[in-house]
């Protein structure tokens, strides 16, 4: 049984120059989506039975940076943030993911503060990307600049 006092979330980024990146290029490793990562974090929060454990998501590479708190007292709030994101229409989730990876927003609520030019830039990336996996590759490449 593991009972940590502190859990810090760090989203995986596959960076050029690493063995994992080489595996990615050869197809031995495939990227998972931000939504899959969020679901994994949700499962961690939901299944944790520890008392007093502090969970933080305090880095720009984490999609939902505001998911932080004590697992015993803030669990429902953190799950609410995650469920709010997962409940967004797919297009809005993709736009938020791109805006976040472009360092333009921190939370989905920040999307309403974007300029029309920013929104057009995001839409251009979204609509000119061939498929969802190609989008994950673009997002991973954007995140490389943060580490």
Regions found by a protein language model. Name each.
Residues 3-8, 12-147:
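Auxiliary Fe-S-binding modules of radical SAM enzymes
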């Amino acid at each position: 049984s593991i009972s940590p006092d502190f859990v810090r979330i760090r989203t995986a980024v596959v960076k050029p120059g690493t063995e994992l990146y080489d595996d990615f290029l050869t197809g031995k490793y495939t990227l998972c989506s931000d939504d899959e990562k969020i679901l994994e974090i949700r499962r961690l929060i939901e299944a944790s039975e520890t008392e007093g454990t502090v969970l933080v998501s305090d880095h720009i590479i984490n999609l939902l940076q505001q998911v932080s708190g004590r697992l015993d007292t803030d669990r429902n709030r953190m799950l609410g943030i995650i469920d709010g994101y997962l409940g967004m229409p797919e297009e809005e989730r993709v736009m938020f993911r791109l805006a976040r990876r472009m360092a333009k927003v921190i939370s989905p609520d920040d999307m309403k503060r974007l300029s029309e030019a920013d929104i057009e830039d995001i839409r251009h990336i979204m609509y000119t990307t061939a498929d969802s996996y190609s989008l994950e590759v673009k997002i991973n490449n954007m995140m490389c600049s943060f580490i």
